[in-house]
């Protein structure tokens, strides 16, 4: 439906904005986010999470693995030949992988806002946030590629 597409576009836009604000300073000058860049990053995060929850609820049933896809997945894990004609397995797996990665991305930053973890714990949570964010962006890029490729077959 149109609402799902709009939410997907908003979620991807928020992810792009957060990626640019997070990694541009790090790549350009090896500095962390501060000031307005940090406020933009933090301001788009709740919108992204709300969109992610909506996408999980609205696309979750469509992206469940069917009996044939479970068989294909098991064959691929056991390195057996598997028929992949019209298979949606990788598209569904990247969807669930992306949705799963959104949890540690969100919770690691949320947990680091509390002082119960101490200084070292906050640094560890920040590193978890950085690396899971990078994995999330990579997974979403692969998912969008597979989605567009499947749509324009």
Which role does the model predict for each range below?
Residues 1-153:
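Membrane-embedded alpha-helical bundles that constitute the cytochrome b-like, heme-associated redox core
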């Amino acid at each position: 439906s149109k609402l799902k597409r709009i939410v997907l576009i908003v979620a991807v836009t928020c992810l792009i904005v957060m990626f640019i604000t997070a990694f541009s300073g790090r790549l350009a000058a090896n500095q962390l986010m501060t000031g307005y860049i940090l406020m933009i990053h933090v301001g788009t995060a709740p919108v992204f999470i709300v969109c992610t929850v909506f996408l999980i609820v609205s696309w979750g049933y469509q992206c469940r693995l069917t009996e044939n896809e479970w068989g294909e997945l098991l064959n691929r894990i056991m390195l057996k030949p598997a028929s992949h004609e019209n298979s949606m397995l990788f598209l569904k797996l990247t969807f669930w992988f992306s949705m799963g990665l959104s949890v540690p991305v969100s919770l690691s930053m949320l947990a680091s806002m509390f002082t119960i973890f101490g200084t070292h714990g906050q640094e560890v949570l920040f590193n978890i946030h950085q690396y899971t964010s990078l994995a999330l962006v990579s997974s979403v890029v692969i998912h969008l590629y597979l989605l567009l490729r499947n749509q324009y077959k």
